[in-house]
């Protein structure tokens, strides 16, 4: 008998429907803080609308799982740690597949349609399902329904200071986590919201102006910092390793180029979703300062950002 798990992610209601809710709940480490509405800096947002029903169809015979038709347009292929991924589309209908690493190559297939909250997930036996692959599939599905609603996950590490957020951007290995650790060690009152994939959402502030807010999410990489809270964004800072500490406020064109690479690559490969993401970025750079920090991995770099953004 199908049962439902309900979560609240970035102010939206998400339902997971399956025949194995107890097992599913144990697999989804990081999701438990999201069974309630997010804590906010001041007033709670309006009642969370339902944007996704993720229905898991467990197949005891993985060979019976239908793969996407070959005539569908290939959007993107890429590898993750535990599998190989592909996304195809035909009109408004999209199909996302993960082939799990190892013997048997167990598939996980998502069927989605623009404008629909229903996501059908077909997978092999639950006891053989890789939890990391399931979490990644949920991340893809959430992006699919959230991006058209001015909401996107950004590859970044987020510090909260004085009830506002700074998102540190950069390619993997640039030193985002290293820099945020320097904040935690040397700047009193700072704390980490998320260390890999926070969710940025364009919302109206108290002055009725559209501005970015950031939410913690169930997806936080190896740091596993899963905090269900929401804060206004003070700034975005793109990191660059450098033999000295220097911070520069970017022009709107430079700011666009700083934010774009931190958006989900699978969606940037698709014309429709790229357009939606570009609209989100445009709304961000109209109201929010974006900086480039060229820096050493030292506490003076963190202090430089604090003084620039907050003082």
Task: Briefly describe each language-model feature range.
Residues 179:
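Hydrophobic positions on the alpha1 helix immediately C-terminal to the Walker A/P-loop
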Residues 1-167, 171-172, 182-191, 199-311:
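A noncatalytic interaction/capping subdomain that flanks phosphate/NTP-handling catalytic cores
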Residues 175:
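Conserved glycine(s) of the Walker
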